[in-house]
A protein has these predicted regions:
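Residue-level detector of flexible, active-site-proximal loop/helix-junction positions
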Residues: 98, 135, 172
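Catalytic Cys-His active-site segments of thiol-dependent hydrolases/isopeptidases
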Residues: 73, 121-154
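Short, well-ordered loop/turn sites that connect or cap secondary structure elements
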Residues: 100, 104-107
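Acidic, glycine-rich loop-and-strand cores that form catalytic or ligand-binding grooves
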Residues: 81-83
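Low-complexity, Gly/Ser/Thr/Pro-rich intrinsically disordered linker/tail segments
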Residues: 153-187
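Surface-exposed intrinsically disordered loops and tails
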Residues: 85-100, 139-157
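N-terminal capping segments
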Residues: 1-77, 95, 107, 115-118, ...
Length: 187
């Protein structure tokens, strides 16, 4: 009986371990992107897009790369190749679980993607973080840094022609801090 319990415990430990770490990476990616949005030394530019300025895709690609998900290392460079590479790096397509009109179902860390035009990341409470446009309403030629407070910013979810929503494994939640694996001893 003891050997069987140990075998079952090991099975479930191994099974659940494949999802461990997802929430920490989600939090790291979200927090990094929000930090960039809150720092006016970073603005929008499609020419100088890997820091200190970013465009919509480079902001999210760099956020996930910094969080330990190797999307940039695996070739993600723009909205047109994000879907395939993000899926290969542990994301799943959860578009069918989302009401794209209202944003209902979008979770913290979800990538909202229009493959041709734009991407943003859900940060919870009906909010997204995104890089939008430079101070002239364009994509290139602005000054370094955020001149308007809305070049890279957080805003409410909005209805956009999103093609898909990608979620990192074990996405959206925060791991409870006081959960321990214990051995059950019958009384």
């Amino acid at each position: 009986m003891e050997a069987e319990r140990r075998q079952q415990a090991r099975y479930w430990y191994n099974y659940l371990s494949q999802y461990a770490g997802g929430s920490e990476k989600i939090e790291a990616a979200v927090n990094w992107a929000i930090q960039i949005a809150n720092d006016n030394s970073h603005g929008y530019d499609q020419t100088n897009r890997w820091g200190p300025d970013y465009d919509c895709s480079s902001l999210l690609i760099q956020a996930w790369e910094n969080a330990g998900v190797p999307v940039k290392s695996n070739g993600a460079t723009y909205t047109g190749n994000m879907r395939e590479i993000f899926l290969n790096c542990g994301f799943t397509d959860v578009t069918g679980q989302i009401n794209l009109t209202t944003g209902s179902g979008v979770q913290r860390g979800d990538i909202l993607l229009n493959i041709v035009n734009h991407t943003a990341m859900g940060i919870g409470n009906g909010q997204v973080v995104q890089a939008s446009q430079n101070e002239f309403g364009g994509t290139t030629g602005g000054q370094t840094g955020d001149q308007t407070g809305k070049e890279i910013w957080t805003t409410g979810y909005y209805n956009y022609p999103w093609d898909c929503v990608l979620r990192y494994k074990s996405g959206g939640g925060v791991l409870p801090g006081d959960v321990y694996l214990v051995r059950w001893i019958p009384g």
